Amino acid sequence: MQWLADYWWIILILLVGVLLNAIKELRRLDVKKFLDNKPELPPHRDLNSKWDDEDDWPQKKP
């Protein structure tokens, strides 16, 4: 861990560089254009919405 104490500033510069590049890329992202061209999501392959069609809850007696 001696190298970490000696070269902490290089790690800090790398982290700042990564952070700045991430901010630059996020600023380039056009959310409205993405939402306009967003692809339709395919249905799930396991069809969870169709495997249990019957009603399992007990019926209320009036």
From Swiss-Prot:
Positions in coiled-coil regions: none
Name the InterPro entries for this protein: UPF0370
Annotated keywords? Cell membrane, Membrane, Transmembrane, Transmembrane helix
Q: Which Pfam families match?
A: UPF0370
For region Disordered, the annotated ranges are: 36-62
For this protein, the parts annotated as crossing the membrane are 3-23
Indicate the secretion signal residues. Answer: none
UniProt subcellular location: Cell membrane
- Please provide, in alphabetical order, the Gene Ontology terms of the cellular component aspect for this entry: plasma membrane
Q: How does it sit in the membrane?
A: Single-pass membrane protein
Check the record and name the HAMAP family matching this protein. UPF0370
Under the heading NCBIfam families, the entry gives:
PRK13664.1
Q: State the family named in the UniProt similarity comment for this chain.
A: Belongs to the UPF0370 family.
Q: What is this protein called?
A: UPF0370 protein plu2724
